[in-house]
């Protein structure tokens, strides 16, 4: 597949914020090439026994970096799907270190409104509600406000069929510039 054109032919974009999330995949690429766009490096090649064409990028931490890297990759490569994977802090007791959470939906964790409290009372961490984020809807050509982003159900179903030694389960993925 030495003449595979990642800018014109279908490929899967896999992203992670840190080296610990992307290095293993990059090390296992066959026919590895690296393309630099702005401050981001995009590694192309083939993974697995079926030699799937993939693009792997380290986005760096934070939603702005992730958005920039994703936008560049979408404009340059035109992947058929994007998988964001990485290490996260879990808040669901059914998941443990090493488990794989398959996202049913993504919620913007930093977009919240807290209930008013009197001066000096502080903030009640449980007294918040999601703050809708305005996005552009391609289907209608208009903007709409959302508090969550659904994940692609077909990709979710395929991911559930992958055999792995790790525990997997569906869950909600929170995205934001917040670390614990």
What are these regions (language model features)?
Residues 4-8, 36-180:
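Glycine-rich phosphate- or other oxyanion-binding loops that anchor nucleotides, phosphorylated ligands
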Residues 28-32:
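Short Gly/aromatic-enriched secondary-structure transition segments
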Residues 9-25:
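Gly/serine-rich nucleotide phosphate-binding loop at the start of the catalytic core
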